[in-house]
Amino acid sequence: LHEKPFKGINGSGKHNNWSLGTDTGVNLLGPGKTASENLQFITFLVNAISAVHKHNGLLKAAIMSATNAHRLGANEAPPAIISTFLGTQVSAVLDKLAASKGDDAIRFDAKNVFKMSGISHIPTLLLDNTDRNRTSPFAFTGNRFEFRAVGSSDNCAEAMSVLNAAMAHELAEFKQNVDAKIEAGMKKEKAIYEVLKQMIKACKAIRFDGNGYSDEWKAEARKRGLDCETSTPLIFDRYLDKQTLRMFGDTGVFSKVELEARTEVKWETYTKKIQIEGRVLGDLAMNHIVPIASKYEALLLDKVYKMSQIPGLNASADIELIKKIQYHTAEIQR
């Protein structure tokens, strides 16, 4: 299971379908039919997006490896910049919510109206109202997110552990912020929406519905402050960032010592994989490619010599081919 064994051939990876559910089977990322169900949906959706925004570099570190580095950014795989895709309708809901003021009514169509104070209606978000942007590494597909950047040789547990821990930490902070507003005298529903509005604005940089392969997006991602690092060893450093240490420490998932140990293993594994592949390539070149090329070169030389014995024959094409073979074999042997 190699993510990208040969240039020009499609690589291999995994799509991790991720959602959250209650112990009674309720999908927390599934749009509902009532105002309270949709409030729940938006709350968990926004918290998920915010978690990805804060830890986009760490999520990339969780799926990066020596072999996956060759796949990410290629035409058949997500880019090496983590962003979230929500689709047109879901994005419109969040944008209108973020722009609303006080008791403004947010109209989506003639029948569906959502008010900040009354929390009367939020439109049901149907599964087929979200398209499937294949260039997005973290896409919302109706009732779940697809994390599409995990390598074929990687265990899904690492990426899921990071995502779950980041989400748990985000939800804990969300509750603290809501509780603070309630203690200040604000009603619970109003407090929830005020915090959600702040979060939607704060994490808007992670939302991108366009072509993740384009050079324009790479430039735009830098402007947005997203992690655009492409060097695998440097990407692993995200595990030791202060924000990462705090998140894992607060959730009790990993201690600083455990993260340092895991990162050391990642660096060592990366180095060994590069060394192994380098040695294999050297063996293939010196013991298989060069001998065959030399044998073919000898056949061409014999052909050119025999052609020279016959007046009028032109061996220039064969001579040029011999020169190319000689040049490339000499470069390999350097």
Regions found by a protein language model. Give the residues of each.
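Helix-rich catalytic cores of soluble enzyme domains
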Residues: L1-A35, F41-N47
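Acidic, glycine-enriched catalytic cores built around paired aspartates
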Residues: P5-F6, N10-S12, T24-G25, Q40, ...
